[in-house]
Amino acid sequence: MDKERILTPAVVFSVALLHLAMVALLWQAHKLPVIESGNVIEFVDLGDFGGGDGAPEGAGAPAAPEPQPVPEPPKPVEPPKPVLKPVVTKKADADIQQPKEEPKPEEKPKPEEKPKPEPKPEAKPVPKPAEKPVEKPSEKPAEHPGNASAKADSEQGNGEDKGTGIKGDGTGRGEGSGKGSGGVKGEHGEGAGSSKGNPLRANGSIPRPAYPTLSMENDEQGTVVLSVLVSPGGHVESVKIVKSSGFSRLDNAARKAAQNGHFQANAWTEFKVPVKFELN
């Protein structure tokens, strides 16, 4: 605390001295110059005594013209500063340049190849089969008109076979008997065996089937030979076409008529039935 009290007056004193020095300097700078006394020159106005050039007295010298203000020289026009264009410096090409990778073109999906339609096979015309004359069975005297009979010993597998029709007679071997009737010619033959796999063979007849309308319009004719398998009791088991007429409509009509036909048989019998379609 004592030191602070001693320093404070000293600081104030030093600041005061600095101010006094500054005031003295300013006073010396602004001090007016003193005119020294010396010989005094007096100016006498000579205009009152008349002029020497014959001008009346009292006429003073002409007043000096007022100085005209000197015009200020024009300021030099500064030329427009040129606009500096930026200089583009190109770097020297590198010795080794990497080629730019070109974008690979996108692969377009290949169109699916449509399968070529297979050419349809041309339907070949079915040649008409040559009509064969139907062999007439040899007529033999029978015990009753229109009937045929054959007798044999039953122990040796012989049996009786009868058939009726417009024309027809014959003999057969085997167990049982068969009978056919209708409007077409029937033939009877002989066969051996008594099972479904080995039936008796005989000729028979069926009612004449209806002539198909389209076949009549197209003038379709021919003979169909059928193989009809008959079970014991006269039921038709199957009908097969042995020989076609060359026209499917005629074949189907004959087959349908055979399936609806009636046969008499006591054993498995296979009948061979010809059906002739003829337009008058």
UniProtKB/Swiss-Prot annotation:
GO molecular function ontology, one term from the record? energy transducer activity
The superkingdom of the source organism is Bacteria
State which ranges are Cytoplasmic (membrane side). 1-5
Region: Disordered; residue ranges are: 51-217
Q: Where does this protein have compositionally biased stretches of type Pro residues?
A: 64-83
Q: What is its main location?
A: membrane
Gly residues composition bias: residue spans:
165-184
**What membrane topology is annotated for this entry?**
Single-pass membrane protein
Residue ranges annotated as compositionally biased, kind Basic and acidic residues, are 90-143
Q: Does the keyword Cell membrane apply?
A: yes
Q: In what residue span(s) does the TonB C-terminal domain sit?
A: 196-280
Annotated GO CC locations:
outer membrane-bounded periplasmic space; plasma membrane protein complex
> A Gene Ontology biological process annotation?
siderophore transport
Localization of this protein: Cell inner membrane
Extract the SUPFAM superfamilies matched here: TolA/TonB C-terminal domain
Keyword set, alphabetical order: Cell inner membrane, Cell membrane, Membrane, Protein transport, Signal-anchor, Transmembrane, Transmembrane helix, Transport, Virulence
Assembly: The accessory proteins ExbB and ExbD seem to form a complex with TonB.
Function, as annotated: Interacts with outer membrane receptor proteins that carry out high-affinity binding and energy dependent uptake into the periplasmic space of specific substrates. It could act to transduce energy from the cytoplasmic membrane to specific energy-requiring processes in the outer membrane, resulting in the release into the periplasm of ligands bound by these outer membrane proteins. Required for heme utilization and virulence.
Q: What is this protein called?
A: Protein TonB
Q: What is the native source organism of this protein?
A: Neisseria meningitidis serogroup A / serotype 4A (strain DSM 15465 / Z2491)
Gene coding for it = tonB
